[in-house]
Structure formats: structure tokens, C-alpha cells
């Protein structure tokens, strides 16, 4: 932490103020994404024609396997892992419903019930699609004492699929908890004795299971794994690579537009104390939805994300308590007339928020969805009030109880805020009823907020305390329960496991809201696992984050 004396003429009777500057690293990207060169139109059109032809071929293959459930499940799994399932949503939905009805409802089993890989794949794909198939299907793989059979010890492929399936568990499924421990322990012991590509798959899954991975990043990883298997479907792989490159061109264009907008605001100069993370913010939102139909949604959410990131830093890395009260009141009034009452340095931020919201409001009016703006403004007011409460705690050096901390920290995690904003550009499915459901704070939302807050606290605790930030959840828990930091981390891990089960329960049919809306919640949660698993990669952009961004926005696939 560095206390700097900064003159503020707009605050009466104070010529200079001491501010706890965080010294965030600057952006590493410069103008890297400012200048986007469009691909040749003829080449683009040719790729699009190839994609359409290959899509038809895959549809025919899915239809041809209707009476071969395992073969069909393998095709569905490959399309999902390769990031092209969005092209076949109806076909996949019909196929899984058919498999569910004919292998579970009628037979209460899967035809390959003595093959661990087949049963685990069947279980995982149906659970992912919301079907509450019973984990009793794994009974065949346990002995009379309830332990998993020793004969499974060398079935690496089956163990890997079992491991992936266990991450779809919900509360009360102790068998899957046991299966996770069994599969994980055994995979860890044999991974160094496996051959490529299976060994690489196991290492990757042990670090990040599919359920917690971002679909777009998982696709990049899976391309080379899938290609290494001689049995891979050449049409699927070619389609996936072509589609990846077409989408990458779209995403780079979007980011170029965003980067020019961001530079026009000149926030890096006006708010040098704040994190300049436009590119990382776009990557975050790209994790929420990458599909082409959500281009407007990405633009809206990225712009608002950039605003709230700056506001967050004003509250916890620069503003004085008196200044923050003025800003909080201005947000509550939501009126351009409030500009005159703000310190000079705050004015560009406040005006930009109003401008961004006015731009969104115009778009919502054109869509006949103006009602959404009420919710968008309410979450902004709520999160800013939360930031204000945290600033008071910090100013007073107050360490709340863990329960008191979490009640506020869930709000300032920003995940109800981001989920609300992510719905704005999603078209007709984002109904008034969907927003009311979201504002009722259902368990899946609280779980997403909890994962966000707990992972953030675990990864950034030391840095935040060094710079005099508000007490973190780790600190509050240690003080209240008289435990060491390691014990607090263990408790947080247990809470993360519980929260993921809540997420999974929220995805069981019947859905509370349309599945695409639930998917935004899941993907926002997945982003946290990617960015905050071991460190705060948003604040401190290191190799892992650079590589992830490059893989999605710089490096094309070789077809």
C-alpha cells in the first residue's frame, strides 16, 4: 500500500488528502486490439459454406445413430467438448430425451450397464441436460460392502468419465461423493503411467473438471486431444476448427469496437489508480456467452463491466469517505444534474455510466423491453450501496462477524449485478418473470455469489490486507472462530463444494427459467474458477491469463 497526498479542490476545507493507492499494474495490451482487420469477404463466405455443409453431415450422423445410444452419446459429447453444440441444440435435445425415455424410464438402466465409461458418460450427459437420473446406476460397480470394485482400478478411461460425472452431484448423493474420492485418488496414482492423449486428459481434468471449465477454453484444449485419437470424427473436427476461426473473427471485431470505445473515454488517464482491464473484462464476458447470437449482449455487459470495475476501484482504492457518500447519493438519484455535486475526478465516471445506460435504454426501447432498465438500475444502486458499506468498515477498521461479512460480500461480489446485466441483450426469453425470479435471490444465485466471493477472498486475501483493504472473509472467519489461515481455507473449500451442488440442483428439470438464462449463471461461476483458482488473474495478469486470452482472441486454429 502507498499513501499518496492528492490535492482535491472540490472537498471543502481540505487541500490534500491521504489515499491508499493500490498500485495496480497497467494494462499489458496497449493498442493490440484497437486495429481490427476484417477477413476477405470471399474467404469468409467460403468458410461459412463449408460450415453449413459440415453441419448437415453431422446432423445426418446424429440421426443415423438413433438406435445406437452409446455411439450417439459419444457424438454429442464430442460436439459439446469441441464447442459446436450450439449448432445442434434441437437435435441434441431430441436425442437425449429419446435416450432418457428408452434407457432409463422404460428400462431403469443403460444397456452398457457393466461398462463404467458408458454408464458414466450416459449419466453425465443426461444430468447436464437437467434429467435427474439416479446415481444408483453405479451400484453395479460396487461390492457387497458398498466400496467400488478393485477391478476398476486399471480402467483409466472409465475412471476419468466417472470422475467427470461426479461433478454433477447434488445434495444427498453420498455415493457420488465416494465415487469422486475413489476416482480422483486412483487417477492421481496412475496418471504418470498412462500414454498420451489419455494422460493429458486426466491431468487436465484433475486440475479443472469439465463442469468448472469455460466451454470456449475447453474447446481449444480439446482440439488437439480429440485429433490425437485415431477414432476421431473428421467432419466434426473440421467443423469445430472452421467455426472457431469464424467466431474468433467476430470476437476480435467486437473487442476492437470495445477497445476504441474505451480509448475514447480515456479512463486509463482519468483514473490512473484503477485497473485498466478492458481486454480481461471482455474475456470474462466471452466466458459467459461466446455464441454469435449474443453479440449485443456481450457489448452491453462488457461496457457495464468496465464501468463497475472502475467504480469498485474508486471505492476501495482511492475515494475518501466523504467523496464516496456523494457518489453513492448521485447513483441513487440517477440524474445528470448530480454531476455538479461530485468531486471533479468522479464526474467522467458518473457521466459515462449514465451514457452507457442511456445507450442500452435506447436499444431496449427498440426491442420493446424497456422494463429491463428498472432492474439494471436497481442492481447498480444496490451494489454501489454495498461498496459504500464496505468503505465504512474499512475506514472504521471494523472486522465484522463472518456471517455479517458474507451478507454484504455476496452483494459486492457483483454476481447478481452481472447476471442481471447479462440478461439485458438476450432477447425475448429474458422476460419480466425471469428478472423477478432473479431478484427473488434463488439458491442458484446465492451459490454463484458464494463461489465468486469465496474464491476471490482465497486468492487475493494477502494482497488486499497488505494494502489496507476491508477485512476479507478469511480474516473474519479466522478471528471469529480462532483458527489459522489454513483451517479457514479448508472451510471455504467445503463451502465451495456445497455451493456447486446448489448450482447443479438449479439445473435439474423442471427449470425455473429458460435454460439459456441458467447457463449465464453457470458460466459466470465457471469464469471464477478460471480467473481466481490460484491467484487473482484479473488484477495481476500473468502467463495463464495471457495464454487464455491469446488462445481465444489472437491465435487461430489451423484447419
Swiss-Prot record:
GO terms for molecular function: magnesium ion binding; terpene synthase activity. The keyword Manganese applies. Mg(2+) 2 binds at residues 312, 316. SUPFAM superfamilies: Terpenoid cyclases/Protein prenyltransferases (SSF48239), Terpenoid synthases (SSF48576). It holds the Pfam family Terpene_synth_C. Mg(2+) 3 binds at residue 464. Its EC number is 4.2.3.-. Belongs to the terpene synthase family. Tpsa subfamily. Catalyzes alpha-humulene and delta-cadinene, as well as beta-elemene, the thermal rearrangement product of germacrene A and several other bicyclic sesquiterpenes when incubated with (2E,6E)-farnesyl diphosphate. This is Sesquiterpene synthase. It comes from Santalum austrocaledonicum.
Amino acid at each position: 500500500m502507498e499513501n499518496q497526498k492528492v490535492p482535491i479542490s472540490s472537498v471543502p476545507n481540505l487541500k490534500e488528502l491521504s489515499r491508499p493507492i493500490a498500485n495496480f499494474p497497467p494494462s499489458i495490451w496497449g493498442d493490440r486490439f484497437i486495429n481490427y482487420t476484417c477477413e476477405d469477404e470471399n474467404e469468409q463466405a467460403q468458410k461459412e459454406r463449408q460450415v453449413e455443409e459440415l453441419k448437415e453431415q453431422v446432423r445426418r450422423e446424429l440421426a443415423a445413430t438413433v438406435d445406437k445410444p452409446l455411439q450417439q452419446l459419444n457424438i454429442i459429447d464430442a460436439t459439446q467438448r469441441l464447442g459446436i453444440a450450439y449448432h445442434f441444440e434441437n437435435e441434441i435435445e431430441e436425442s437425449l430425451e429419446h435416450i432418457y425415455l428408452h434407457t432409463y424410464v422404460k428400462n431403469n438402466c443403460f444397456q452398457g450397464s457393466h461398462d463404467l465409461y458408458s454408464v458414466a458418460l450416459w449419466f453425465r450427459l443426461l444430468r447436464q441436460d437437467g434429467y435427474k437420473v439416479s446415481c444408483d446406476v453405479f451400484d453395479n460397480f460396487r461390492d457387497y460392502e458398498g466400496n467400488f470394485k478393485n477391478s476398476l482400478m486399471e480402467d483409466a478411461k472409465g475412471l476419468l468419465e466417472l470422475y467427470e460425472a461426479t461433478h454433477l452431484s447434488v445434495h444427498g448423493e453420498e455415493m457420488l461423493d465416494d465415487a469422486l474420492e475413489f476416482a480422483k485418488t486412483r487417477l492421481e496414482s496412475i496418471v504418470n503411467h498412462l500414454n498420451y492423449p489419455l494422460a493429458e486428459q486426466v491431468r487436465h481434468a484433475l486440475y479443472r473438471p469439465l463442469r468448472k471449465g469455460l466451454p470456449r477454453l475447453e474447446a481449444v484444449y480439446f482440439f488437439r486431444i480429440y485429433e490425437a485419437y485415431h477414432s476421431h470424427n473428421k467432419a466434426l473436427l473440421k467443423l469445430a476448427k472452421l467455426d472457431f476461426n469464424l467466431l474468433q473473427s467476430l470476437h476480435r471485431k467486437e473487442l476492437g469496437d470495445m477497445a476504441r470505445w474505451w480509448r475514447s473515454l480515456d479512463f486509463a488517464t482519468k483514473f490512473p489508480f484503477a485497473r485498466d482491464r478492458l481486454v480481461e473484462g471482455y474475456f470474462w464476458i466471452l466466458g459467459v456467452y461466446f455464441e454469435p447470437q449474443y453479440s449485443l449482449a456481450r457489448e452491453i455487459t462488457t461496457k457495464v463491466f468496465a464501468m463497475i470495475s472502475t467504480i469498485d476501484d474508486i471505492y476501495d482504492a482511492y475515494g475518501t469517505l466523504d467523496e464516496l457518500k456523494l457518489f453513492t447519493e448521485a447513483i441513487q438519484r440517477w440524474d445528470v444534474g448530480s454531476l455538479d455535486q461530485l468531486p471533479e475526478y468522479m464526474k467522467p465516471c458518473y457521466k459515462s455510466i449514465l451514457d452507457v445506460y442511456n445507450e442500452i435504454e435506447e436499444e431496449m426501447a427498440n426491442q420493446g423491453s424497456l422494463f429491463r432498465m428498472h432492474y439494471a438500475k436497481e442492481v447498480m444502486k444496490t451494489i454501489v450501496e454495498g461498496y459504500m458499506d464496505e468503505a465504512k468498515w474499512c475506514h472504521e477498521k471494523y472486522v465484522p462477524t463472518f456471517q455479517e461479512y458474507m451478507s454484504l460480500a455476496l452483494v459486492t461480489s457483483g454476481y447478481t449485478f452481472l447476471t442481471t446485466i447479462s440478461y439485458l441483450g438476450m432477447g425475448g426469453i429474458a422476460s419480466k418473470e425471469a428478472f423477478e425470479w432473479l431478484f427473488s435471490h434463488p439458491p442458484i444465485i446465492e451459490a454463484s455469489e458464494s463461489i465468486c466471493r469465496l474464491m476471490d477472498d482465497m486468492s487475493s486475501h494477502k494482497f488486499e490486507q497488505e494494502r489496507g483493504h476491508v477485512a476479507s472473509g478469511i480474516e473474519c472467519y479466522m478471528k471469529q472462530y480462532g483458527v489459522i489461515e489454513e483451517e479457514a481455507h479448508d472451510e471455504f473449500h467445503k463451502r465451495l463444494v456445497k455451493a456447486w451442488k446448489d448450482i447443479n440442483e438449479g439445473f435439474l428439470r423442471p427449470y425455473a427459467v429458460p435454460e439459456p438464462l441458467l447457463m449465464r449463471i453457470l458460466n459466470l461461476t465457471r469464469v471464477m474458477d478460471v480467473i481466481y483458482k490460484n491467484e487473482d488473474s484479473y488484477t495481476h495478469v500473468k502467463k495463464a491469463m495471457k495464454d487464455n486470452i491469446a488462445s481465444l482472441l489472437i491465435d487461430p486454429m489451423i484447419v
